Amino acid sequence: MSLQPTATEVGTMYDQYTSLLTDVMAGFIHVGYWDDPEREDTIEVATERLTREIGERLSSVRGQRILDVGCGTGKSAVQIATAHDVHITGITVSNHQIELAQSQYESNTKAGQVNFLFANAMDLPFADASFDGAYAIESLVHMDDRRTALTNIARVLRPGSRLAIADLFLDAGCPNPEVLARFHELFQVPPMPSGDDLKALLHQTGFKVIEFTDIRDTSGLSANF
């Protein structure tokens, strides 16, 4: 792979690996959140908890329109839409994920509550100020132009809307460069920003960071939202 994978390359990777990843992650495609080290929760409970944390940070109101940037199979969208009674549009660059999301969830939830489209966050097909909130769960990590993606997300959000992100970033000093290189190659990941770089980029694209929580010790991975 190149150091800057295209959306097509990322989509092809997920076409190949989505079924395997969802088998491991209890239907989701993101790490879990074990908030109590004394409690031995299952991966299903932990991944649902991470999704719930994201949904709660949106502070959404019933009936609002929310954008899911990198919706995977749609399971997170359904969980958040059901819990908060909002309408969610999910996008992905994987044809296989769109097929799964539409067949498994779109027709089995309240009419109009969730819908899924093939779309690239770096070229969103929505009008300005179309959504009341947005979230991205481990999807920005794949994008070769995060600045453009965040600028596009800001464009389609109404003033005052929230963006909740759960993602990976790289601390200074990689302990195992070979493992990291393999991760980049296998999962089509361009160079990752540091936490400070990500916060700076959010500010530069029009967002105000109101919370930054490090959950690496409770995720089984160096993951942060």
UniProtKB/Swiss-Prot annotation:
InterPro entries: Erg6_SMT_methyltransf, Methyltransf_11, SAM-dependent_MTases_sf. GO terms for biological process: methylation. Pathway: Antifungal biosynthesis. S-adenosyl-L-methionine binds at Q97, H142. It is an enzyme of class 2 (transferase). Disulfide bonds: none annotated. Gene3D superfamilies: Vaccinia Virus protein VP39 (3.40.50.150). It comes from Aspergillus nomiae NRRL (strain ATCC 15546 / NRRL 13137 / CBS 260.88 / M93). It comes from the Eukaryota. O-methyltransferase; part of the gene cluster that mediates the biosynthesis of the tetrahydropyranyl antifungal agent restricticin that acts as an inhibitor of CYP51 and blocks the ergosterol biosynthesis. Within the pathway, rstn1 uses S-adenosylmethionine to methylate position C4 of desmethylrestrictinol to produce restrictinol. The highly reducing polyketide synthase rstn3, the short chain dehydrogenase rstn4, the cyclase rstn5, the FAD-dependent monooxygenase rstn6 and the enoylreductase rstn7 are required to generate the first stable intermediate desmethylrestrictinol. Its EC number is 2.1.1.-. This is O-methyltransferase rstn1. Pfam families: Methyltransf_11. The lineage of its organism: Eukaryota, Fungi, Dikarya, Ascomycota, Pezizomycotina. GO terms for molecular function: S-adenosylmethionine-dependent methyltransferase activity. Belongs to the methyltransferase superfamily. Keywords: Methyltransferase, S-adenosyl-L-methionine, Transferase. It catalyses: desmethylrestrictinol + S-adenosyl-L-methionine = restrictinol + S-adenosyl-L-homocysteine + H(+). Transmembrane segments: none annotated.
